[in-house]
Amino acid sequence: DGGIQWVRQQVASGVDVTTVVEKGKAAFIGPELYKKTLGVIGLGAIGSLVANIALSLGMDVYGYDPFLSVDAALRLDRHIHVVKDINELYKRADYITIHIHYTKDTERMIDAKAIGAMKRGVRFINLARGEIVDDDAMLAALDTGWVAAYVTDFPNNRLVGAPHVLAMPHLGASTPESEQNCAVMAVDQLRDYLENGNIRNSVNLPAVSQERSGVCRLCLIHKNVPAMLASI
């Protein structure tokens, strides 16, 4: 609607819109994605999808996820480089996109040290949670040019209007259909846990998905300590 309104205003003022648009195109020149390297932090349902799509666009893709599940690994194209050291991703990626949960462990995970390990001129995309990125460190890196651009789905007073920051409203699920789908998904997953003990999309528990082999099942959650089960 904003774009349509702008055109109407220009036409009403007697402005040649075609000339203005052609002249302004130079402000939007940017590098192509083809043959660039993308780093994907978090290879869950969303991260693995992003990685596969980026590969189809001709990008070289590196992924990092210390908690990569078997299901997520099977979804990944075999040409995606999965690294065990996040610094390997940092030093290679022209673009970095992050898709992880926000927890105490991931709060300000992208700090000055992490940014310093990245390539100069990296473009960083945060569609996960705002708290994962240290705004002070990111703005400082943007000011020096170490980070060329920062795209975030979590605008605040400091980021909105800052140079080289593209801040978008958090609108990914703002449709009537998605609101209903989210509610149905939550109920389905809760019911699956209560009836079958399966755990899906949990932030603080590992994924559990096993078919029933009898009337009852016994599940023990414990630390990975040798001889723990034998002592129970």
Language-model features: locations:
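Rossmann-like dinucleotide-binding domain for NAD(H)/NADP(H)
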Residues: 120-212
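Hydrophobic Val/Ile/Leu positions in short beta-strands of Rossmann-like dinucleotide-binding domains
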Residues: 38-40, 220
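Aromatic pocket-lining residues of Rossmann-like dinucleotide-binding sites
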Residues: 53-54, 118
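N-terminal Rossmann-fold NAD(P) dinucleotide-binding loop
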Residues: 47-48
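Phosphate-binding beta-alpha-beta segment of Rossmann-like dinucleotide-binding domains, i.e.
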Residues: 1-37, 201
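A conserved regulatory-domain signal marking ACT and ACT-like small-molecule sensing domains
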Residues: 200, 204-232
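Glycine-rich Rossmann-fold phosphate-binding loop(s) that bind the pyrophosphate
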Residues: 36, 43-44
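Rossmann-like adenosine-cofactor binding region
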Residues: 35, 66-158, 174
